[in-house]
Amino acid sequence: MSGAGVGGGIVIVDKPAGMTSHDVVGRCRRIFGTRKVGHAGTLDPMATGVLVVGIDRATKLLGLLTATDKSYEATIRLGQTTTTEDAEGDVVETTPATGITDEQIGHAVAALRGEIDQVPSAVSAIKVGGQRAYKLAREGQTVELAARRVRIDRFEVLAIRRVDGFVDVDVAVDCSSGTYIRALARDVGVTLGVGGHLTLLRRTRVGRFGLDEAYPLDALADEPRLSHSLDEACLLSFPRRDLTPAEAESTRHGRALAPAGIDGVYAAAAPDGSVLALLEDGPQRTKSVVVLRPATL
């Protein structure tokens, strides 16, 4: 199946453990027969779950979809720190944690809800002096990253298990884009004085798109299919503005329109229902965020 043949769209992939997000993109290029493939929001190799993959023209949406809220299920191990703040790193320190009470864990988790200033993980993809932080960290260099304001709408303890001197805490997280779940695990451990790292991470939602519509890669290889067409993806993710024929013609040629009074980015739909562009209101005129179907197409 060629992604170009259907005008592009998005595929919700259930990423397996052990693959990088780029590996998934490579596999989808072969499955859909096009080089024009990208993803919205990197998942580490150990992580599983929702990876939004854009095919052909839908790759233009990925930067906007990356910035949407996300949901995760994770397991935090208290009593041990690692070099990467997850199970893939080397153990740095082990501290008996079985004396930590459920109430103490609950308080430490609750303290990280709401808007917080979070120091990203040292093995994040943030650039430091032109180099990715994770590359510098894995070379043994000390990486210091500035705190960033993030929003944690939900940070809930689902289960607590005490095993071999450790405490494993299953949690659910709803958060803004840019939140590092590894950093939450680290900070809970710091608060409790025993250290902590992430042992499991599964992304359950990116914006509007959840696990309930995610395909395993093997299923896509057997039967290539889009989760949503380009138009569906736009209309599910953004408010809709219906254009008149004259407005549609102006939009195709990149000309600004009168504002619609819609907050944020919205989908500008032609009379036939196809989405021509993603627009944003300015004080006097609209501005084009992404033109999906220009007059030259």
UniProtKB/Swiss-Prot annotation:
Broad class of enzyme this protein falls into: isomerase
Pfam families documented for this protein: TruB_C (PF09142), TruB_C_2 (PF16198), TruB_N (PF01509)
Listed EC numbers: 5.4.99.25
Molecular function GO terms recorded: RNA binding; tRNA pseudouridine(55) synthase activity
InterPro entries assigned to the protein according to its UniProt record, in alphabetical order: PsdUridine_synth_cat_dom_sf (IPR020103), PsdUridine_synth_N (IPR002501), PUA-like_sf (IPR015947), PUA_sf (IPR036974), tRNA_psdUridine_synth_fam2_C (IPR015225), tRNA_psdUridine_synth_TruB (IPR014780), TruB_C (IPR032819)
Record carries keyword ATP-binding: no
Catalytic site positions: 44 (nucleophile)
Functional note: Responsible for synthesis of pseudouridine from uracil-55 in the psi GC loop of transfer RNAs.
NCBIfam families: TruB
HAMAP family hit by this protein: TruB_bact
Family membership: Belongs to the pseudouridine synthase TruB family. Type 1 subfamily.
Name assigned to this protein: tRNA pseudouridine synthase B
Classification lineage: Bacteria, Bacillati, Actinomycetota, Actinomycetes, Mycobacteriales
Gene: truB
